[in-house]
Amino acid sequence: MKLSGILLIFVCCWSGTSRAANVNIATLTCVKYQNEVIAAPNPAPGSDPINTMMWLFGYSVAKSGAHVMYGDALASFGFALDAECKDNPAESLLEALSAVKPNTKNPMDLTELECQTFAARHLDLVKSDLESANTIMMWLYGFAVAKAGGHLFDADAVGTFESALMGDCQKNPGRSLFDELTGVKWGKSKSP
């Protein structure tokens, strides 16, 4: 009897964490995003609010039509998204992302960055500062999902995305990072 009770608790916890990993930003309201994703009382194992915000930031930049990474804009983007969601709690997160405009200081044009240069820098950063490398990869992942027309955030798929992107950069070292991001294939999370 004890074993079946433990098994039941494990199954409930397991199903809860798998649901937490996938977020449909087209149907998620701002109020749910703020209460259940960013400030979740019981966050899913491995969840990281900064990486979630980076994914949303990359997604927002791609949806705006821009092809740049703004190195100094994460904080202002986060505050602007927070304000948009507080002012419009019933709005979908996808709509809120469309309304938020990032600070455009210090842009890095992804069309001018060769894939081989990015890959070398990324591998160096992985060795020296894994957390920062993962955070940047999360931004690129959000950007690629938006470019593919998707609207699902699956934090568990960032590793698959990273492997696919790095593999594509190895095959096409002279292509721009932007071109690779718009064509990378990494599995079911790419589209809705």
Where are these regions (language model features)?
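Positively charged n-region of N-terminal signal peptides that target proteins for export
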Residues: M1-G5
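Bacterial N-terminal signal peptides
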Residues: I6-W14
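Sec/Tat signal peptide C-region and signal peptidase I cleavage site
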Residues: G16-A20
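Compact alpha-helical subdomains of small soluble proteins
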Residues: V23, A39-E112, F118-P192
